[in-house]
Amino acid sequence: MEIVISNSKSELGEKAAITGAGLIREAIQTNGAANIIVATGASQFEMLNELVKQDVDWSKVTAFHLDEYIGISEKHPASFRKYLKERFVDKISLRNFHYVNGETDPHAECRRLGEIISKHPIDVAFVGIGENGHLAFNDPPADFETEEPYLVVNLDEKCRRQQLGEGWFNSFGDVPERAISMSVKQIMKSKTIICSVPDIRKADAVKGTLEGEVSPMVPASILRQHKTTWLFLDRESSSLLT
């Protein structure tokens, strides 16, 4: 794992975006096209803002959505489809973007997306880490073993409180209890993982990811077993590392 510690969130976002864009260009040069995964949440603001500015032939890129709440409208402020359309998809010209639809039958949606992603080996996965150490919406204890590319998952209280704290919902009761998430194994199949984790509120999760045991209780700790992961931190998120 390559660990890069920046002085600020903006510097972190720029470095992560430049690194990721270079890997996308390499995939296009080698294969004629690239397949990527894109994450959401407050931790990805700076990275995505810089990524759309990079010199990439986006018309050769197919992108996949990491996760989505079950049961909220695409127009809801917390919808990850809305987030990605506004911050990423509408700013570039992708070959294709495969959204997770949380308003349809969730198990059928998992099967639909699983069939598509199985035909698109992922070159670069842009991900983050939650305050509870989750990877995508795989909250602890995460399922490290399932081969299913997408899962219906239950969101734990700490995860739901993080979403409330970031301002996506008006009350804790408004935060959905379930979501569709890409599985840990599917994320780990990615050729390269770019993990962007700013902010002091992520410091405990970063410490657990890097210094504890690799465990389903700290889902992101499994990134240490991936051959090519870049972990981008800032001074605050790295402040508890020894």
Describe the role of every protein-language-model region.
Residues R25-Q54:
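Glycine-rich N-terminal segment of FAD-binding domains in flavoprotein oxidoreductases
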Residues A136-M182:
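Class I SAM-dependent methyltransferase SAM-binding "motif I" and its flanking Rossmann-like core
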Residues M182-K185, K189-T242:
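ATP/nucleoside-binding phosphotransfer catalytic cores, i.e., glycine-rich phosphate-binding loops
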Residues W58-F126:
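Ligand-binding beta-strand-loop-alpha-helix segment within the catalytic cores
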Residues M1-I36, H107:
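N-terminal glycine-/serine-/threonine-rich phosphate-binding loop
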